[in-house]
Amino acid sequence: MRTPALAFALMLATPLSGGAYTVITDEHVDLQIEYVGGSLRGKIRADNEGNVARDTGLLYDGPVGTTSIARPASSTWNFLGVSAGQPIYYWSANNVPGHIFLGFGSDGGTIPGGTFASYYESDARVDETAPWNKITLTAMRYTAAPGESGAANFSLWQVDTFGDVVKWMATADGITSTDATWLVESGHAHYNWGFTKRGHYELDFKFSGYLAGSNTYI
C-alpha cells in the first residue's frame, strides 16, 4: 500500500507554517508499518509525541540540530547525489544526542507475528529467507529553503558489519523498484538518511509482503 507524505524540514530558519503539523525533533522516531483491515499502512511513532498521522507529522532539523559532512571522494558515495567535498546533510543510523534518530518498524504489535509468510528474497542486498515486509520509495517532492536552488536528492543507506556501504534508496539516478529496503515482520531497523539541500522533503513509500497461509501479495 502506498503511504504518502512523510515530511521532513531540513535546516530551515523556522519550521514550515501554514499546515497543521506536529513538529518532531531531537528524538527517536520510527515510520511504523501496521497491518489493518487486510492492508499495510504507515504512521509516525515518536518517543515523545507517541503516534502521529503520517501526513501531519513534520520531522524538523533546524540549524542547531542538523548534521552535515563533506561527501567522501570514493566513488562508493556517488549515489548521494553531490560531488566529493560537497556537504551532505544526514540523520545517522546511530543514536546521536541532539539529532533525530529515524528508522522503520513493525514491532510493538503493529504486525503480529505469523501475519506474513517467509520467502526467499533474491535481492543481493538481502539474499535471505524471512517473513519480509518490503518498503519501496515511490516518489519524492522537494521545496527549497530560502537561498537554495536546483534539484535536491535523498538517499538511504547502512554500513554492514564488514564496513561496506549498503545503498537502499537514492533519487540521484532516478526512482525505480530497486529503491527499496526489507524489514523482517515485527522488526525494527535504523538507517542513515541523506539530503543534499536544505528545504522541505516529502517521501512516499509503498509497503508490501506475502500473507501467511494464502501467500497473497499485498
Question: What is the predicted function of each stretch?
Answer:
Residues 21-187, 216-218:
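Phosphate/adenylate-binding glycine loop and adjacent helical scaffold
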Residues 189, 197-201:
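Short tyrosine-centred short linear motifs in exposed loops/low-complexity segments
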